[in-house]
């Protein structure tokens, strides 16, 4: 009923928009939280990580490793990202390298289009496969406000997940 009423099959999107508005996050904070959410696909865990490490540019890798190890058993990841659990430091390292010591927004301005961002994320961000990349880009579009419109639903991708095709068939 929630999804039909709000025309959203992913309630965390609504909640992220509420939190961004309520706490008046700036664009860099939104981008950082969107990436954390992309690694976990579990908004409570993403929010906890963000509260511990609120500034992307100030995250110390050794502290992140220690914190991740200390909190491993308590952190929850969504089923689709369960194999990311425990790899937050490595994922962060790849994200930091990808951003390349500049504002996060500059990276997206440089890449410009959905397809360019998609290809770059898949290639450069550790443990971001098709599914993680899709909902990460969805979050960037729907919550952060980046103009990332997919050029395809990836229905021709027979080598990976079938859930997006099955879901579309069910919806039709």
Q: At which residue positions do the language-model features occur?
A:
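Generic structural signal for hydrophobic core residues of well-folded globular domains
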Residues: 34-42, 121, 125, 140-141, ...
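Accessory, usually C-terminal, subdomains that scaffold auxiliary metal cofactors
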Residues: 138-172
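Short acidic alpha-helix initiation/capping motifs at coil-to-helix transition points
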Residues: 4-14, 110-117, 158-161
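Helix-hairpin-helix/helix-loop-helix acidic hairpins
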Residues: 76-126
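Structure-specific DNA junction-binding interface
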Residues: 1-88, 142
